[in-house]
Design a protein with these regions (language model features):
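Active-site environment of divalent metal-dependent phosphoester hydrolases
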Residues: 10-14, 36-40, 58-63, 86-91, ...
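Glycine-enriched alpha-helix->loop->beta-strand junction motifs that scaffold or abut catalytic
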Residues: 47-51, 122-124
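Active-site neighborhood of phospho(di)ester-bond hydrolases with catalytic His/Asp-centered motifs
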Residues: 5-7, 28-34, 52-57, 79-82, ...
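Mid-chain, well-packed structural core segment of small domains
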Residues: 74-109
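N-terminal active-site segment of His-dependent metallophosphoesterases
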Residues: 1-49, 59-61, 66, 141-152
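Short secondary-structure boundary/capping segments
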Residues: 43, 61, 68-71, 99, ...
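Helix-adjacent hinge/juxtasegments
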Residues: 50-88
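Binuclear metal-dependent phosphoesterase catalytic core
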Residues: 2-3, 17, 70-74, 100-103, ...
């Protein structure tokens, strides 16, 4: 299972469109907020894929998405959110505890506009960075194994 992970497009769709084009074989697309509705303009590129969109702190009056998404990917539970409600700019304890409540193996978040990935006791914490600057991530889940690539256009 290949997952395209983007965040923080803030109304800019040029790099978002390129990331979608480069990962046409992804089965899941996740937008972690602050521009989650930008995917609507590119619906033809997301057709046939599972799409998860989370509210960010800048989406509160623009979108009707959920604050977090919990979903399966090839038998692995994924916890996805923007991160602002878990104060990720100050640390990862709150978001780690939230993800572990759902027995997640992958925790995706945005908000900081900085790419980050780290394994913490079997939980992958991953921030794709800001797609507005060309940053995104691809996560691969196969037979319970998880790997990722942080990318830039």
């Amino acid at each position: 299972m290949k997952i395209l992970v983007v965040s923080d497009s803030h109304g800019s769709t040029a790099f978002l469109e390129q990331a979608l084009s480069r990962t046409r074989d992804a089965g899941i697309v996740v937008h972690l907020g602050d521009g989650a509705d930008d995917l609507e303009a590119l619906r033809e590129l997301t057709g046939g894929k599972l799409v998860y969109q989370c509210n960010g702190n800048m989406d509160l009056y623009r979108c009707n998405y959920t604050d977090r998404c919990i979903f399966p990917a090839d038998g692995v539970t994924v916890f996805a959110c923007h991160g602002h409600l878990y104060d990720v700019k100050s640390g990862f304890l709150r978001i780690t505890l939230a993800a572990k409540e759902f027995n997640s193996r992958i925790c995706l978040f945005g908000h900081t506009h900085s790419q980050f990935a780290e394994d913490r006791d079997g939980l992958l914490l991953l921030n794709p960075g800001s797609i507005r600057r060309g940053d995104y991530a691809v996560v691969y889940v196969e037979n319970g194994n998880v790997r990722y690539e942080l990318k830039n256009i």
